[in-house]
Design a protein with these regions (language model features):
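C-terminal functional extensions of proteins
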Residues: 174-175, 183-218
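Periplasmic-binding protein-like
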Residues: 35-45, 139-147
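A polyampholytic, Gly/Pro-enriched intrinsically disordered region
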Residues: 22-25, 78-92, 126-129, 183-197
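N-terminal glycine-rich anion-binding loop in soluble enzyme alpha/beta folds
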Residues: 1-24, 82-119, 209-217
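A C-terminal functional module that forms or caps the active site or interfaces directly
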Residues: 140, 147-159, 164-168
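Short, acidic/small-residue loops that bind anionic groups at enzyme active sites
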Residues: 55-75, 158-176
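Charge-patterned, long linear interaction tracts outside catalytic cores
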Residues: 123, 132-135, 139-150
């Protein structure tokens, strides 16, 4: 298993603007991964930036942490995320994945993504409190709304009497391994390669730029 950072984009992803800025780098990284022989890609963000675009660009499975986590959560799940401003984004994702009727609520803990690393103790306490609120209001499971909450699941579950907690990154990695074991590929009838057209301004995303230019040459 390997990991890579996008070469251009925001320091964290908390808004629709952040998603747009991150997507080209996500697609570029997915293309490079396939070229390097990687068998599946996981997008390390709960908002699934560039997910559909990456699936169009490659034939290997591309797993979105958000989609995989919501599907693993079962019924009556809440999303406990960094900021309340993400409520609309997660509601939109749940509808897109056909899971809106399973989601009870979205709770922001008031800790920005970058602060998850700088003050883990405060972030963990806020995550436990947000998860407690969700459980008290009827949630049967909690999905972390940020992969930066990695490692919090056991402590949150223990503090809340065994509440089911989905830690999105390891969950998505498991889904990727299963896709590889089952020899899955991206269905190109559903996610066809992009149509030929000139593009400008993406030279830093060399693999994405090359894909579009090769399609145009075809």
């Amino acid at each position: 298993m390997t990991n890579s950072q996008i070469k251009q984009g925001p320091a964290s992803i908390e808004s629709a603007v952040d998603e747009v800025l991150a997507a080209p780098g996500v697609v570029d990284s997915a293309i490079k991964a396939e070229e390097d022989g990687v068998q599946a890609v996981v997008i390390d963000c709960m908002l699934d930036p560039g997910l559909d675009a990456a699936r169009e660009a490659v034939s290997i499975p591309v797993i979105g942490c958000g989609e995989a986590a919501m599907r693993a959560a079962g019924t009556n799940f809440a999303i406990v995320t960094v900021l309340q401003r993400q409520e609309r984004a997660f509601a939109d994702l749940a509808r897109r994945y056909g899971l809106a009727d399973r989601m009870t609520e979205i709770i922001g803990i008031g800790v920005p993504v970058l602060a998850l690393e700088s003050d883990r103790k405060t972030a963990l306490a806020a995550t436990i409190e947000g998860s407690r609120r969700a459980m008290e209001r009827g949630a049967k499971s909690v999905v972390f709304g940020c992969t930066g909450m990695l490692g919090f699941a056991d402590e949150v579950s223990s503090a809340l009497h065994g509440l089911k907690v989905i830690d999105p990154l390891p969950n998505a990695i498991t889904a990727a391994h299963e896709a590889i074991q089952n020899s899955q590929t991206t269905d190109k009838a559903v996610y066809p390669y992009p149509d030929a057209k000139p593009i400008v301004g993406f030279r830093e995303c060399a693999a994405l730029d090359a894909l579009m230019r090769s399609q145009a040459d075809d």
